[in-house]
């Protein structure tokens, strides 16, 4: 039951950390690809 109660906060933390990191990484790769071309 504790895991179920903590799930929203865990999801928020995960999304708050992983999504910006993924967005920045994809943006960085996109810029690098455009620089080469």
From Swiss-Prot:
Locations listed in the record: Plastid, Chloroplast thylakoid membrane
GO cellular component: chloroplast thylakoid membrane; photosystem I
Membrane protein topology class: Single-pass membrane protein
PANTHER family in alphabetical order: PHOTOSYSTEM I REACTION CENTER SUBUNIT VIII, PTHR35775
Described function: May help in the organization of the PsaL subunit.
Matching NCBIfam families: PS_I_psaI (TIGR03052)
Family indicated by similarity: Belongs to the PsaI family.
Annotated protein name in UniProt: Photosystem I reaction center subunit VIII
Lineage: Eukaryota, Viridiplantae, Streptophyta, Embryophyta, Tracheophyta
Gene label: psaI
């Amino acid at each position: 039951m504790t895991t179920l109660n903590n799930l929203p906060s865990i999801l928020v933390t995960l999304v708050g950390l992983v999504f910006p990191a993924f967005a920045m990484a994809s943006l960085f790769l996109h810029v690098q690809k455009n620089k080469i071309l």
